Amino acid sequence: MNSRTIARRSLISTLVLILFLSSLTPLSFAQHRRTVSRHTAPAQKSIPRQQLEGTKHERPPRTYDVLNYTIRTRFDVPNKAVIGDETVTLKPLASGFKSFDLDASSMKIEAVTLSDSNTTLQWIQPPDKLAITLDRAYEPAEAINIRIQYRATPEKGIYFVPQTRSGMGLSKPAQIWSQGEPEENHYWFPCYDFPDDKATSEQYITTGADEIAISNGALVETTNNADGTHTFHWKMDQPHSSYLISLVVGNYAKLTDAYKNIPVEYYTYHGTEEIARRAFSKTPEMMRVFSEKLNFEFPFNKYAQTIVANFIFGGMENVTATTHADTEILNGGITNDSRLSTENLISHELSHSWFGDLVTCKDWSQAWLNEGFATFMEAAFREQEAGHDAYLAEMRSDAFLYFLEDNFKYRRPIVYDRYRQPVDLFDATLYKKGALVLHMLRETVGDEMFWKALHNYLVENQNKVVETSDLERAFEETTGQKLDWFFEQWVYKAGFPELRVRSLYHPQTHSLTLNVAQTQTPDATTPAVFRLPVEIELVTAQGKRTEHIEITERQQHFTFKLDSKPLLIRFDKGERILKKLDFPQPAARLAYQLSHSADATGRIEAAEALARMIAPPAANGINPAVISALRQASVNDSFAGVREMAAAALRRRGVTEASRLGAMSFFTNERAGATFLNHW
């Protein structure tokens, strides 16, 4: 799911707080579109950190297994009502099964019967439920077919959008579309509305004469009815959680594409076909990249993407039938500034086909197994397209946005079962820190083992629901490593290490000492000590080398023999660890790093540090060589993020002005930056 509306409100409030704080770092938000840093997340002053509020939630007790939903719908558009006729097929989990509940809200139940015999059943409607009493006790071997006739007037879950005209004169057809995640499909059809039960589904959707219906699975047939309406029969024969069931109805143009022998479909408004095709054009390539990286082919029989108006999120990974906000897709097909954001949105939702649809979180506390993966896979596709520097830039952006949430809102573990509503969990911790944990896991076990373990995880758990322990097991069995420490500190605990590093070179002995302290404040969920494998890059006039250390204590000292004075010291080469780092270095060393670091993250890191040196009041007496290095990088660096960072550093005019201009730039460039607003 890509929930931009809620995310935007949250981030706006956070930015207002940041701009209000007088000690905000002078580095503007403009540079953080793609090149954000662990160093400059605003940490000098924060509001008191809170916990995410809410009560403890557990998986609901389940007494049955739903096998299939067959849903027949037509619509009373003037009254925004769904007229439904549904058959739910289920089996008891234990003997003596006499009654059960389905989730059902905002609907009038007209009849409940056994569809095989037309036997009328007793039922009542407690709040948000449909409680059904069966005609007798049933055993686990017996399949029960329950027919429910109803009329729903949903307050959520399904939406009726009238025909509108955009500011560009574009006509948007009248539409009906659904949005089930996290628990809202029960507003338009009775169901078990929790992710830990998977069933197949079938829909018969009756539309107006000039409309079509798009849904999950394969289109079996279209029937032309005597009254001029059409009925579209869709069938999804792979089991899936109920929140992934969807429909879209409207007057759409259909574009076709393919990945191997799998149909790929794009549904857009008439008159926007060229724009939509350009926006969606990389979908087959994304399918290829993900299939090859995971060594696991696209797992369904088709993939469709449909744009809708007034969508409450940016995108939603309904199984085989993704729904997108029309503005996100059409803007990406029009302007180059929006292209990266649109591609990230498309790759995010597509990757849910593996992580979220095929393999699904067992409950919402485990939702990072859906959303953290989808956010990580965005970066994996960017890496394939633009190289490892682009991938690391995505990780830096994720870190910055996670730091904003941690510093100005609340801190929580990734796996967390306290909330008011499930959607409360769909935050930067879930998406951004979740992606960063996968990045760190990749660095911990190595690239080959990482992708092999993900393949094994998918093979073992396809068509199932999962918990973090299933992922941990897949990695331990694949790599032979014990990884409980990793998951404990990064997934089940909260926060991140805050490191203070000081270096001292001893010319008499040609040795370098690094003093490392973990300074984070421990609490009930934040560890006092993180276990951190770290790479140290050391460069002298005679050459360079990489040292491997492991931090396991609050304070440690490391000594390295050198042949001469260090020209460059990189702590955590390649930015493999989520952290905040306090490591002051002289301007000459940073200027060397800006000019010579092999990876873009090292050059960005140096540019950020130099930016703070030349911003008032630190700018007094600044070495002209620093200005020269920044000017060279702003023009000549091969990576756009480095050029942007260096150029922005040269524009520093002071805290107040930089903060104000930076926030304005952040909003005007949010699409090009593909930030948190784009990927929820």
Predicted regions and their residues:
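Bacterial N-terminal signal peptides that target proteins for export
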Residues: 2-14
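Bacterial N-terminal signal peptides
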Residues: 12-24
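Hydrophobic alpha-helical and helix-loop surface patches within well-folded domains
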Residues: 30, 130, 234, 260-516
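N-terminal, polar/Ser/Thr-rich
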Residues: 30-83, 115, 170-175, 186, ...
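Extended, low-hydrophobicity, Ser/Thr/Pro/Gly-biased non-transmembrane segments
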Residues: 48-49, 60-63, 149-252, 278
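Surface-exposed beta-strand/loop patches in extracellular or lumenal glycoproteins
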Residues: 85-106, 192-193, 201-208, 469, ...
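A surface-exposed beta-strand-loop module
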Residues: 100, 104-167, 228, 553-565
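Non-catalytic accessory/interaction domains
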Residues: 207, 270, 351, 448-451, ...
